[in-house]
Amino acid sequence: MARAMDNSILETILQQVRPLIGQGKVADYIPALASVDGSKLGIAICTVDGQYYQAGDAQERFSIQSISKVLSLVVAMRHYPEEEIWQRVGKDPSGSPFNSLVQLELEQGIPRNPFINAGALVVCDMLQGRLSAPRQRMLEVVRALSGVSDIAYDVTVARSEFEHSARNAAIAWLMKSFGNFQHDVTTVLQNYFHYCALKMSCAELARTFVFLARQGQAFHLDEPVVTSMQARQINALMATSGMYQNAGEFAWRVGLPAKSGVGGGIVAIVPHEMAIAVWSPELDPAGNSLAGIAVLEQLTQQLGRSVY
């Protein structure tokens, strides 16, 4: 690394970025998220050899939202042959908003990738077909990866999302009309919203996702989470599609595979080195954490890290 890591580096970066708070907007289309304190700012790092660094609000839990789409894909990879997954969802960036219907209509119900809403709903539909208790299975996976036994769903957030689910329901029904959605729409939506409503901290997220920096192997688990090839593929999808329609801008500024959520979290991977989780609830127009991206930009510049 260009500099040796320690908590003081992270604390300095947060101080440098904090003036940006107030320039973004907390997600308000989900009422339960609209009340989150927009001034929160945290970062945590878990290295491939199990060292931890953190600063700011790194221990406070928040709604991970679309970060969960990576986890649902991981579960699907453990239960389906790859060819079955990629027959129903693509591997390309969409270039459109994450909840777009237009592209889905034009491409006959096949979502561009598993990290937009349509793609994640297809993945959840697949899990409904293989798992007897999809919500419980997700909790088991997340608790094992994080090493934290009390991670849970925020039922209030899940309920709030379901009560405002018209667009996601439309996406599911549109895919059903093309034959790319097999199970009860309401049941799958409920599972999807619960996944999005997982509450985790930056520290828990960094530990959960470090397997993607370790070729699919979590350092505290005996069995691989995914194969080394699958870990590489997930990182590639995160690099091209993890930041919604701003994936190119993020690659330019930060240069790491990453996945964001409208709860203000971002998880980024430095392959073979570390997983990074940042949180700042105020979003930019694309739905990504405004200050969170700035923190990652500062960090990668100071550490001299990029996959490009």
UniProtKB/Swiss-Prot annotation:
InterPro entries: Beta-lactam/transpept-like, Glutaminase. It catalyses: L-glutamine + H2O = L-glutamate + NH4(+). GO terms for biological process: glutamate biosynthetic process; glutamine catabolic process. Keywords: Hydrolase. Signal peptide: none annotated. Coiled coil: none annotated. Its EC number is 3.5.1.2. GO terms for molecular function: glutaminase activity. It is an enzyme of class 3 (hydrolase). Substrate binds at residues 66, 117, 161, 168, 192, 244, 262. Homotetramer. Belongs to the glutaminase family. This is Glutaminase. It comes from Citrobacter koseri (strain ATCC BAA-895 / CDC 4225-83 / SGSC4696). The gene is glsA.
